Regions:
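Short helix-capping/linker segments at secondary-structure and domain boundaries
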Residues: 38, 77-81, 127-137, 165-180
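Phosphate-backbone recognition surface of nucleic-acid-processing proteins
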Residues: 57-60, 66, 70-149, 153
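Short capping/connector residues at structural and topological boundaries
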Residues: 10, 14, 87, 99, ...
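A residue-level signal for conserved active-site and pocket-lining positions in enzyme catalytic cores
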Residues: 34, 122, 164
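Low-complexity, acidic/Ser/Thr- and charged residue-rich accessory regions of DNA metabolism proteins
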Residues: 103, 141-187
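Glycine-rich, often acidic, oxyanion-interacting loops/wings at catalytic, nucleic-acid
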Residues: 1-57, 182-185
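Hydrophobic (often cysteine-bearing) scaffold residues that line and stabilize catalytic clefts
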Residues: 30, 37, 64, 114, ...
Length: 187
């Protein structure tokens, strides 16, 4: 679009009015300025993630990049306000609802009540991990394959996002590095 717009604006056969050409030129300039601001903010996020020890540990988790790590730390700090990883996941709205009657439990969809931005970041990260599952640690890859064999891909993605949030909580609260899940050997 950047290369085609000047040609379109100068093309006499299109019979564009002068005011329309001026408007399009102004919009192109605004787009260039917004793109430059986005690139600058991306550089700031990358720099912040490299300088922050918690961010460095978080980015070791599959599906968690600099944007997700910095957003999580900005929102929850060291996550010590949450007693368990499940509480953090619930705060983000990534835990399933539950309906039970007559001693039978039924899990429902996620609540979507928490931090929408963080929930979206973790779900998109989980989506990329599921798409690249063959490149993941053997334990995680095996778990994903088993889940995908039993249920819909979107359910697996949300389940993985929940798991990633819990991993992030553990990394932040325990001040440890991420350890990939190991496939248990059964005889």
């Amino acid at each position: 679009m950047d290369r085609q717009l000047p040609r379109i604006l100068e093309d006499a056969e299109l019979r564009l009015s002068g005011s329309f050409r001026v408007l399009m030129a102004q919009l192109k300039l605004e787009l260039e300025q917004v793109t430059a601001r986005i690139e600058e903010m991306d550089r700031v996020i990358q720099k912040t993630a490299k300088e922050n020890e918690d961010c460095q540990r978080l980015t070791e988790i599959p599906g968690v990049g600099p944007v997700t790590a910095t957003a999580l730390i900005a929102a929850v700090g060291n996550a010590s306000t949450f007693q368990k990883g499940r509480n953090l996941a619930a705060w983000m709205g990534i835990v399933p609802g539950e309906y039970s009657t007559g001693g039978k439990q039924k899990l429902l969809g996620i609540s979507k009540r928490g931090n929408k931005y963080l929930r979206t970041l973790f779900i998109q990260g989980a989506r990329s991990v599921v798409q690249q599952r063959h490149k993941q640690a053997q334990g995680l890859s095996h778990w994903l394959e088993q889940l995908l064999g039993r249920t819909h891909q979107n359910v697996v993605i949300v389940a993985l996002a929940n798991k990633l949030v819990r991993m992030a909580w553990a990394v932040l609260c325990k001040n440890e590095r991420y350890r990939a899940p190991v496939l248990a050997v059964t005889n």
